[in-house]
Each structure stands twice: as structure tokens, then as C-alpha cells.
């Protein structure tokens, strides 16, 4: 297989195989299994059940199966490879599609005007290698992404699940000199679950005074569930999941509202919402927060880490002016 295999999805998601990638040891004398932290140089070092290795030099895929022939062990085996489901341009409506088993982005795009995605199902997205760094490769894959500027970007009534990175996102990193405007962004009435980040957004501060900002952004009526519970937990950086993820970026914004959503459990962070200026933070209203005891949140300007406890509601009201919020605290085993 020439294109990188992202993951094995077995029996339509009952199980997944773990994609082994190699990282350099601290002294660079050998390479290690990214998860087990033991010496790994080739397929011959596979020994854990349902670990697999895709050999980049010849394209051969090796799967370790302790229970015999995988074709007899499993009723179905899907192997997403490194490609997008769709790559969108300006003035596109994607309506009533099922997009599954895609190794890169389900729907990807650069700077785009008028992209509407509605009534779609996207699942088992991402996990292939994006690039090879100095010490280890980086995997990637979002359900729906615009990287760059946008106008009239609408995602409505979609079911998005099991994405290696974010379910839905608009983003631009902190490089370059160009102005970037993200405006009229609406994520509404979606169910997003078992992704590392249900919704991810960030706007990096550009060089040489370029103008980068978001305006007229609305997240409403969404059910966001179980960030950090899906196959994206294969990632080595396991301490990043959150239901809404802004990272610690510049994130200049105006008229940014998060209204009437359900936030249902996430670990280790419930939310990660921050900006360089407190006036750029979104306003929250009438959201329901189902919170795992013992987790935390990264919030505010400047960003700080807060414990999820009985004071969480007061904290959200103070930082984001939330009115009408509901806060429900559960143990991890309380809710299936």
C-alpha cells in the first residue's frame, strides 16, 4: 500500500489496531515504540496484540494478531489511508453524505468563502502521518477543517465521531504576514463525540502586524461528548483533549458566542478556551456542562488551569459571563 495506513478499524469499530510509529531515544542511539517506550526498529519487533507497522520503504503492512488470521478473527477490516474525503473550494454545499474511513481530513480546505456542510456523517477520520519531524512523525486528521480565512462557514446537523484530532475546526497558525479574517462561522445542531477535540479553533498572531481575527462566530445547539475517549488516544500527547480547544493562541475575536450546547465529559480538560485579551473571549449562555470530577480546565486571559469542582459554575460566569448554565458533576463510571 503506497499511501500511509492510518488505523485498522475492526468489526465496524468494536476494536482498533494501534499504529506503531518510531521515535528516537533520548541519546538518538536507537528508535523506540511510541507507546511502549521499548526498542523498535522493524516489523520483527511487533509483539503486542493488534499493533501494526506500515513499512514506508516498501508499503507492506504488518499486523500482530495473537488469535490467528485476522480475516477469520474479524468480520470486517477497514484500513483508512492518507487522503481526504473531500477537498472544498468556494461556494460549495456538501449535503447528506456519509464520509468514513479516511486517513487525512474528512473535508479539508484552505482559505474558503461559503462552505456549507449539513446532514452529513463523518467517522473514523485521520491518523495517517502528516510529516516526519526530527525525533518522531506527527499524525493528523480532522473531520471538517478550514485552514485559513473563511466567510459563511456553516456546519449544521452533522454527526461527527472518531476523529484522530478535531471533529470540526477553523484555524491558522502563528506564521506569515498575510491578513486572515474568519467571519460568519456557525456550528449548529451537531453531535460530535469520541474525538480528541470536538471543536477546535485558533488564530495565531501573524508577523509584522498583519491583521488576523474572528468575527460573528456562533456555536449553538451542539452535543459535544467524550473528548479524549476515541482512537485519537493513540497519540503520544495524551494531555491535550478538551471539548472546545483554542490552545494558548492570540485568538482575537468579536461577537463570538457559545449558546445552548451540551458539554458531556472530557478528560483531562473539560474546556480549553483562552485569548491574549479578555475582551476577545467568547460569551457563553445556557449551556449544560456534564463534568468529570478530578479533571481540569484551561481558561481565560491570561490562561490559567482550574480544577473542576463545585466552584466551576461561578468560574464560568466570571470569565465568560454565562447566564443560564447548568452544571452536573459525575464520576467517570456514572454515565455510559
Regions found by a protein language model. Give the residues of each.
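Acidic, glycine- and Ser/Thr-rich low-complexity intrinsically disordered tracts
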Residues: 1-49, 53-55, 251-259, 266, ...
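Extracellular polysaccharide-degrading/modifying enzymes targeting complex plant/algal/animal polysaccharides
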Residues: 1-101, 108, 128-139
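Extracellular beta-strand/beta-solenoid scaffold signature
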Residues: 2-5, 49, 78-85, 101-108, ...
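Feature targets compositionally biased, intrinsically disordered low-complexity regions
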Residues: 12, 58, 67, 84, ...
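Residue-identity detector for threonine
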Residues: 16, 30-31, 41, 57, ...
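Secondary-structure junction/capping motif
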Residues: 69, 207, 214, 238-248, ...
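Right-handed parallel beta-helix
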Residues: 90-101, 113-133, 140-143, 150-171, ...
Amino acid at each position: 500500500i503506497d499511501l500511509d495506513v492510518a488505523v485498522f478499524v475492526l468489526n465496524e469499530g468494536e476494536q482498533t489496531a494501534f499504529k506503531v510509529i518510531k521515535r528516537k531515544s533520548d541519546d538518538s542511539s536507537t528508535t523506540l515504540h511510541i507507546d511502549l517506550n521499548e526498542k523498535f526498529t522493524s516489523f520483527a519487533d511487533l509483539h503486542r496484540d493488534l499493533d501494526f507497522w506500515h513499512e514506508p520503504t516498501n508499503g507492506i503492512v504488518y499486523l500482530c494478531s495473537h488469535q490467528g488470521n485476522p480475516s477469520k478473527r474479524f468480520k470486517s477490516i477497514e484500513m483508512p489511508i492518507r487522503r481526504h474525503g473531500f477537498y472544498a473550494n468556494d461556494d460549495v454545499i456538501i449535503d447528506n453524505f456519509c464520509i468514513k474511513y479516511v486517513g487525512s481530513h474528512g473535508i479539508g480546505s484552505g482559505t474558503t468563502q461559503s462552505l456549507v456542510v449539513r446532514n452529513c456523517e463523518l467517522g473514523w477520520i485521520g491518523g495517517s502521518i502528516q510529516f516526519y519531524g526530527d525525533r518522531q512523525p506527527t499524525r493528523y486528521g480532522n473531520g471538517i477543517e478550514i485552514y485559513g480565512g473563511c466567510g459563511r462557514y456553516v456546519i449544521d446537523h452533522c454527526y461527527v465521531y472518531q476523529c484522530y484530532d478535531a471533529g470540526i475546526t477553523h484555524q491558522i497558525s502563528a506564521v506569515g504576514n498575510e491578513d486572515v479574517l474568519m467571519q460568519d462561522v456557525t456550528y449548529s445542531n451537531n453531535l460530535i463525540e469520541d474525538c480528541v477535540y470536538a471543536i477546535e479553533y485558533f488564530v495565531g498572531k501573524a508577523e509584522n502586524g498583519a491583521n488576523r481575527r474572528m468575527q460573528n462566530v456562533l456555536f449553538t445547539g451542539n452535543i459535544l461528548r467524550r473528548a479524549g475517549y476515541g482512537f485519537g488516544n493513540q497519540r503520544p500527547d495524551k494531555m491535550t483533549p478538551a471539548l472546545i480547544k483554542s490552545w494558548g493562541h492570540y485568538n482575537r475575536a468579536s461577537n463570538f458566542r457559545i449558546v445552548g450546547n451540551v458539554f458531556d465529559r472530557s478528560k483531562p480538560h473539560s474546556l480549553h478556551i483562552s485569548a491574549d485579551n479578555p475582551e476577545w473571549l467568547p460569551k457563553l449562555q445556557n449551556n449544560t456542562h456534564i463534568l468529570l470530577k478530578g479533571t481540569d480546565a484551561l481558561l481565560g486571559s491570561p490562561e490559567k488551569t482550574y480544577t473542576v469542582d463545585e466552584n466551576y459554575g461561578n468560574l464560568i460566569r466570571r470569565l465568560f459571563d454565562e447566564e443560564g448554565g447548568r452544571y452536573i458533576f459525575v464520576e467517570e463510571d456514572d454515565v455510559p
